[in-house]
Amino acid sequence: MKNQNVAIIIPSRLNSTRLIQKPLQLIGSITLIERVFKQVNKANIQHTYVATDSEEIANIIKKIGGKVILTDSDIPTGTDRTYEAFKLIPNNNNIHYIINVQGDIPFIEHRSILKIIEYLKNSEYDIVTPVVRVDRESIEASSNVTVAVDYMGKALYFSRSLIPHGAEELLYHLGIYGFRKNALEKFVSLKQTFLEKTERLEQLRILENGMTIGTCLVEDVPISVDTEEDLKKAIKFCREN
């Protein structure tokens, strides 16, 4: 099987500040976390896991044949949870790339994940992440994250505000991170930063500490479920497609 040195980890915390028991919310007939796992699993990566603090989430994934790693509930971010899970993967010395797919993207396309893997392997960035070009009018602030990049596509800043100011076309950030193993290990050794806490964006810890994030342009714009309104949009999308 290709990509034997890659692990995909989907961190899924039961309690969310903005949407109660978010992973267990139904979209159509199945839960949010089940939809995410099924989409990610289409990438056909052997080392694909859900990392969770919830037995209920674990049982849902196990029932559909998925692999689960149970983690503590007091882990600060999804990437920190990803690393805790990575340490528990058997024979993880053979894994050199870790893909963190946030557990709130129910319609993520597996081809975006595969593109990230290839881009990570063939670049010199510490971390890579996908972005999509969108019109300013089509994206709302607060529940969406945009990124400003340099001419080479290196990320300069991420924000829940629309950046850069005045631009008609923006880069919408998708919640997937491709880490080199040493970059992930460095990330979790660093303390949370002021900007990370202010924007509630863990990737700012990376930038504030001088590490590099490369952006990879993809075409799909999946819905990210962070609020009740996002959930309604996801349910509507599921019903219509």
Curated annotation (Swiss-Prot):
Q: What is its main location?
A: cytoplasm
A single GO molecular function term of this UniProt record: 3-deoxy-manno-octulosonate cytidylyltransferase activity
Q: Where in the cell is it found?
A: Cytoplasm
User: What is an annotated GO biological process for this record, any one?
Assistant: lipopolysaccharide biosynthetic process
Pathway membership of this protein? Nucleotide-sugar biosynthesis; CMP-3-deoxy-D-manno-octulosonate biosynthesis; CMP-3-deoxy-D-manno-octulosonate from 3-deoxy-D-manno-octulosonate and CTP: step 1/1; Bacterial outer membrane biogenesis; lipopolysaccharide biosynthesis
**SUPFAM superfamilies per record:** Nucleotide-diphospho-sugar transferases
Q: What is its EC number?
A: 2.7.7.38
State the CDD domains in the record.
Answer: CMP-KDO-Synthetase (cd02517)
Domain of life according to the entry: Bacteria
Q: Does the keyword Protein biosynthesis apply?
A: no
Task: Report the catalytic activity.
Answer: 3-deoxy-alpha-D-manno-oct-2-ulosonate + CTP = CMP-3-deoxy-beta-D-manno-octulosonate + diphosphate
Q: Name one Pfam family in it.
A: CTP_transf_3
Which keywords are on file for this protein? Cytoplasm, Lipopolysaccharide biosynthesis, Nucleotidyltransferase, Transferase
GO cellular component annotations of the record: cytosol
Among InterPro entries, the record links this protein to:
Cytidylyl_trans, KdsB, Nucleotide-diphossugar_trans
Keyword ATP-binding among record annotations: no
Q: Which top-level enzyme class is recorded in the Swiss-Prot or TrEMBL entry?
A: transferase
**What's the family?**
Belongs to the KdsB family.
Give the protein's biological function: Activates KDO (a required 8-carbon sugar) for incorporation into bacterial lipopolysaccharide in Gram-negative bacteria.
Cite the HAMAP family for this sequence.
Answer: KdsB
Query: Could you identify this protein by its name?
Result: 3-deoxy-manno-octulosonate cytidylyltransferase
Protein's organism: Rickettsia typhi (strain ATCC VR-144 / Wilmington)
